[in-house]
Each structure stands twice: as structure tokens, then as C-alpha cells.
Amino acid sequence: MSSSASSAGKSSVSSGSVKGTAALGGVVLGEGRTKVIVPVTAETFDEIAGQTASIAKLGGQTASGADIVEWRMDFLSPSIDALTALERLADSADLPILATFRTADEGGKAIEASAYRDLLLAVARSGKVGAIDVEAFRDESTVREIIDGAHEAGVAVVASYHDFHATPAAEEILARFGAMDAAGADVLKLACMPASVDDLLVLLSATHQASRIFDRRAFIFQHGPSCESICKRI
């Protein structure tokens, strides 16, 4: 892979040369083969080193078995400075970094709204990441401030929404994607918890419609053990 974590933040933000594509740290989503994103959920510096070493040993379609590292900052110990941890991660992971802080509202850790904003902006401006994840349905002005700040730093933005209790109707999914698109995100992401075949069909329909409506790259993720059992029954 030509893009390294340490240079990813210097790449320009782009929606890709083809409708439905997006460039994150030099890796184009929606073009060519399926891209592999591997999470780092380290609490300590030692765990950062250990997890990135494990990623490097993976087999797969690229030399390291992955295309992008998703750094889950909400797993990091409060005693460790996030930017120092990012330096360590960028030095050891020769891949573009997608930086994510998942808040308690969407299955992660509690954080004050101002601290969430300041952290994402600092990470985006660090020159060490290719993209940041922004929870799209927080305060609208804060979301736009984060997206604008990231773009000014040359960093792509993944707008996300998570519902771990149900599957929204297709109309709601498309409305949420529309709001993410209007806010200027480069990638639109929605994750939910299907409980039936009907739920899976809703997600397939919404995915198909989104691919025809939006120029941005849109992703829908299904979580939970029920998804696997439903697919087996199909």
C-alpha cells in the first residue's frame, strides 16, 4: 500500500472520480475490490503496539490484510493523551487511519459535547489521519463545525448513525442519509440490528435506493447474532 498512516492526513478530500466512491487517506471506497477496515481498540500504548503488530501479520488481499485502520479512541485509557497515542499508532500502522470516538448514545463511552468536538478537530488537524467518524445526529452546528474543520485539514469525514435496538424504515434510512449528505460528509454510514427477514429486505432496498440517489458512498451495516441466523434461514 502506497499510503501510510503518517501521510494520510495530507491527502485531499475527494468523493472519488466515480459516483458512489470516496477517498479516505488514498484508499478509494466503492472502487475495485472490497476494502478491509480493521479496528484498533487499545487501552494502552503496549496494546496499540500489540494490535498493530497483529494487523501486520494478517493475510488477505493486501500485504497486511487490511486497507484502513479504524482507531476507536473511546477504548483508550483516560490517563493517556489521545494525540500522543495517535503518534504511536501512526508510527506503527503503515495504513491510513480512520479515527472514531463512539459516544455512549451510540454504544461507546460518555464524553462532553465540547470535548467530543475538540478531540475530533485536534485529531483531524494532526496530519496523522485520513478520515474521522462523526456521529451525524448530535448538535447540528457542532457536526457542521467538525466536518468543516476536517475538510479544511484535508481529512475525509464518515458521518454515522447507530441503532442497536431496531431497523429503521427505508424512508427513515434515506432521510438520515440525506441529512448526512447535506452536512457535507464524504461517506454515509448507518448501522442497525435486524431481527427478521423483513428487516434485511428493508436494508437491501434502502441500500439500493441510496446508491441511486446519493453521490456519496453509502454503507449500511447489520449487527448482532440474529443477522447470521436470519441469513442462514434465507
Language-model segments: what does each one mean?
Residues M1-G50:
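N-terminal amphipathic alpha-helix/helix-capping segment at the start of soluble metabolic enzymes
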Residues V28-G30, T52-A63, I80-D94, L120-G127, ...:
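Acidic (Asp/Glu)-rich catalytic clusters
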Residues G32-Q51, T103-S114, S160-E171:
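Active-site mouth loops of central-metabolism enzymes
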Residues G32-V36, G65-D67, A93-I97, K128-G130, ...:
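Short, well-ordered coil/turn segments that N-cap beta-strands
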Residues T41, I68-P78, T100, E112, ...:
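Catalytic beta/alpha-barrel core
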Residues A82-R88, A113-D118, A170-R176, V202-A206:
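Charged helix-capping and loop-helix junction motifs
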Residues R102-L120, P225-I234:
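Cofactor- and metal-binding active-site motifs of prokaryotic enzymes
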Residues A136-I234:
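Catalytic alpha/beta core domains of metabolic enzymes, predominantly
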